[in-house]
Amino acid sequence: LIKTIDPKKNIFLFELTSKRKIVLISIKNTIKTSEVENLGAEFYGRIKNEKNNEYFLVSDSLDAKHINFLGPFLHGLKLKSYEFKKYKSKKNDKVISINIVGSKNKPSLQNQLKFKALEQGTFYARDLVSEPGNVLHPDEYAKRINSLKKLGLKINIFDEKKLKKLGMNT
């Protein structure tokens, strides 16, 4: 049985049994990095509600044109997986494992570190904007941003006097 998940994205599901499925992703010859990230996000959207929680990506099946496919694909998947769970009483603790099988076309350690830094920054920003206003007031926001100094970020926090002096009319 073949079920087309989304023919525009070229993601197809083959059901072998109720517990075993194969997901095929067809890639265009020329594909932009943002499209690859969107495919990763689309893939996560499809698998997040499945009973199965372990998936295998075969990296050897990628041709030379798509040598840098897996890094952005996994990055898009990771960004899509974000959930703000801080105030939820029932937390979804499901862990989805993505295993890369094969010896070719794996993302380099440098790429993995770059994407991890982007994901951490994105998730931090998403956490901040998801906090309610009665929790993340200006003083608390300044405190949280100030904690980024340890990462080497230069931070200037202005009080009301400094803002008036700069002509910001607060």
List the predicted regions and their residue ranges.
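Short amphipathic alpha-helical segment within the helicase RecA-like ATPase core
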Residues: 1-170
